[in-house]
Amino acid sequence: MLDFEKPLFEIKNKIESLKESQEKNDVDLQEEIDMLEASLARETEKVYTNLKPWDRVQLARLQERPTSLDYIPHIFDSFIELHGDRNYRDDPAMIGGIGYLNGQAVTVVGQQRGKDTKDNIYRNFGMAHPEGYRKALRLMKQAEKFNRPIFSFIDTKGAYPGKAAEERGQSESIARNLVEMASLTVPVISIVIGEGGSGGALGLGITNRILMLENSTYSVISPEGASALLWKDSNLAKIAAETMKITAEDLYELNIADEVIKEPLGGAHHDVETQAQSIKRTFESHLSELNQLTQEELVEDRYQKFRTIGSYTE
């Protein structure tokens, strides 16, 4: 339960208590229950339609939030996962493979968090090593060779900053992805489904279209990290979250995100199937547009997208 959800849980507990009392004592409390349920519906709508940036950060980080592998089977047909970077090892924090979207063969890559403690240790909490980024690039270059569109799922706090990862060329692997993705001659679409953190997210983010789920975030650093650097106090993360403009709505207004995909009330974890179908429809719409472009136009479209991000004064 998140802090901003506490009032809702208090009402839910009262409803459950009344229902138990009604059943146990054989008394009619239905009128009170109906009133509380109506109140819960109103409060739920009020809470989730007025979320602050820090609230969305908390939702993006939820353990229960759907991961790449939760969405993929609902969106792509006959998905087959492929493994390894053909150099060092297979990185479980980065998944990828091939499947079909409306009969068209596509390549899918994405960061993968764990669903529980054991799985998170196996997946390294979604923080990929260099071999993860090299695996993703191998699959993207394969997609280019066979003229398959690419879909990337961004969901990471950042690339793994450990000593071994740095020794194996973490920064080089991400930089290589940026260079190579910029010149891919097939449609490339990314979606931020949770946290999109730092260069670890950008390593899958040089795409023709950047989509974001309503409660996802995309930033160069976490709010805690930003507040510690700027104000020497990580407790000011709430203020940093507002200042940094990291929410989907903010990034859409800044022309960084191309579309914000609505989530079920309360977050994507409340209805994975509905959320997946919404993502699928959005993928189909953007892919239909990009399929009309030539290879040269796709590269130019991607180039212009990133050239026009941001503002400057002379």
UniProtKB/Swiss-Prot annotation:
The keyword Nuclease does not apply. Pathway: Lipid metabolism; malonyl-CoA biosynthesis; malonyl-CoA from acetyl-CoA: step 1/1. Keywords: ATP-binding, Cytoplasm, Fatty acid biosynthesis, Fatty acid metabolism, Lipid biosynthesis, Lipid metabolism, Nucleotide-binding, Transferase. InterPro entries: Acetyl_CoA_COase_a_su, ClpP/crotonase-like_dom_sf, COA_CT_C. It catalyses: N(6)-carboxybiotinyl-L-lysyl-[protein] + acetyl-CoA = N(6)-biotinyl-L-lysyl-[protein] + malonyl-CoA. It is found in: Cytoplasm. It is an enzyme of class 2 (transferase). Disulfide bonds: none annotated. One of its GO terms (molecular function) is carboxyl- or carbamoyltransferase activity. One of its GO terms (cellular component) is acetyl-CoA carboxylase complex. Its EC number is 2.1.3.15. Its main location: cytoplasm. The keyword Lipid biosynthesis applies. Residues 32-289 form the CoA carboxyltransferase C-terminal domain. GO terms for biological process: fatty acid biosynthetic process; malonyl-CoA biosynthetic process. Component of the acetyl coenzyme A carboxylase (ACC) complex. First, biotin carboxylase catalyzes the carboxylation of biotin on its carrier protein (BCCP) and then the CO(2) group is transferred by the carboxyltransferase to acetyl-CoA to form malonyl-CoA. Acetyl-CoA carboxylase is a heterohexamer composed of biotin carboxyl carrier protein (AccB), biotin carboxylase (AccC) and two subunits each of ACCase subunit alpha (AccA) and ACCase subunit beta (AccD). Belongs to the AccA family. PANTHER family: ACETYL-COENZYME A CARBOXYLASE CARBOXYL TRANSFERASE SUBUNIT ALPHA, ACETYL-COENZYME A CARBOXYLASE CARBOXYL TRANSFERASE SUBUNIT ALPHA, CHLOROPLASTIC. This is Acetyl-coenzyme A carboxylase carboxyl transferase subunit alpha. It comes from Staphylococcus saprophyticus subsp. saprophyticus (strain ATCC 15305 / DSM 20229 / NCIMB 8711 / NCTC 7292 / S-41). The gene is accA.
